From Swiss-Prot:
ATP binds at residues 66-73. GO terms for molecular function: ABC-type transporter activity; ATP binding; ATP hydrolysis activity. InterPro entries: AAA+_ATPase, ABC_transporter-like_ATP-bd, ABC_transpr_TagH-like, Bact_Polysacc_Export_ATP-bd, P-loop_NTPase. It is found in: Cell inner membrane. Residues 28-239 form the ABC transporter domain. This is O-antigen export system ATP-binding protein RfbE.
Length: 239
C-alpha cells in the first residue's frame, strides 16, 4: 500500500559566513521558514523542519498552508527526497512525481519535445514508454508549434503547462505540487484543476502547497498548517 511517513524528522542546514549580527537580523526578518539556531563561529544553523511526524496513506489528499517562508516548499522537497533529513526517519512506499519551481529538470536550450523526453526519462520511463506519452502531453499542454522551439523562448505560463502535462502523465502513487495553479491563464487553470480532480480520483497520495484556500478545499481532504518549522493538522472547517 502506498504510504509516506515522517517519524520525528528534523531538517537543518547551516548558513556560512554569518559573522555579522546584521546578517543574523536579516535572516530573522525575511523568515526562513524555520528557527534560527545558535551560531558556531561564522555558521548559523536554520532548522527548517523541527521534529515533525505524520502518516499519509492511500486516499489522502493534503493541502499545505502557511505564510511565505513557513516551510511548505522545504517539506515538499523533503517528502520527495530532494532534501535529506538531518535526523528522524522517512518511509516512502510508492513512486513520486513533483511539480515544483518553473523549469526544474528542463534544459532551456532544448525544444519542448526534447524536454518532454528528457523529463520522462529522468522520471524513470523507458524510451518506448516516454515516446508513447508524447501525443497525450502534446494535446493537453496546447503549445502547438512552440514545442519545436527552445524552452527559453517560452513564457512562464507555457513552461508550467509543459511541466504540469509531463508530471500528470506519469500517474505516480505520490504527487507533490508547489503552488502550481498560480501560473498560467484562467482557462488553463480550470483545465488543470479538472485534470487534478481526475488524477486524485484514481490516485493514492496527493500533497499540494498553495495560498489558494478555495482550491485546497476543492482538491484536498486533509490540511497541514506549517509555522516556523512545526506542523499542525487542522480541520477542513478552517477553509
Amino acid at each position: 500500500m502506498t504510504s509516506l511517513i515522517f517519524k520525528n524528522v528534523t531538517m537543518s542546514y547551516p548558513i556560512y559566513n554569518a559573522h555579522s549580527q546584521s546578517l543574523r537580523n536579516q535572516l530573522v526578518r525575511v523568515s526562513t521558514g524555520g528557527r534560527i539556531g545558535g551560531s558556531r563561529g561564522e555558521v548559523v544553523t536554520v532548522t527548517a523542519l523541527d521534529n515533525i511526524s505524520f502518516e499519509l496513506n492511500s486516499g489522502d489528499s493534503v493541502g499545505l498552508i502557511g505564510h511565505n517562508g513557513a516551510g511548505k516548499s522545504t517539506l515538499l522537497r523533503t517528502m520527495a527526497g530532494i532534501y535529506p533529513a538531518s535526523s528522524g526517519e522517512i518511509i516512502r512506499e510508492g513512486s513520486v512525481a513533483t511539480v515544483f519551481e518553473l523549469g526544474a529538470g528542463m534544459d532551456p536550450e532544448l525544444s519542448g519535445y526534447e524536454n518532454i523526453m528528457r523529463m520522462l526519462l529522468l522520471l524513470g520511463n523507458s524510451v518506448a514508454s516516454a515516446k508513447s506519452k508524447i501525443p497525450e502531453i502534446e494535446e493537453f499542454c496546447e503549445l502547438g508549434d512552440f514545442l519545436v522551439l527552445p524552452v527559453r523562448t517560452y513564457s512562464s505560463g507555457m513552461t508550467m503547462r509543459l511541466m504540469f502535462a509531463v508530471a500528470t502523465s506519469m500517474r505516480p502513487e505520490i504527487l507533490l505540487i508547489d503552488e502550481m495553479f498560480g501560473t498560467g491563464d484562467a482557462a488553463f487553470q480550470e483545465k488543470a484543476e479538472k485534470r487534478m480532480r481526475d488524477w486524485i480520483a484514481g490516485s493514492d497520495i496527493f500533497v499540494f502547497a498553495s495560498h489558494d484556500r478555495s482550491l485546497i478545499k476543492k482538491l484536498c481532504n486533509r490540511i497541514f498548517r506549517l509555522e516556523h518549522g512545526l506542523i499542525y493538522e487542522e480541520s477542513m472547517d478552517i477553509l
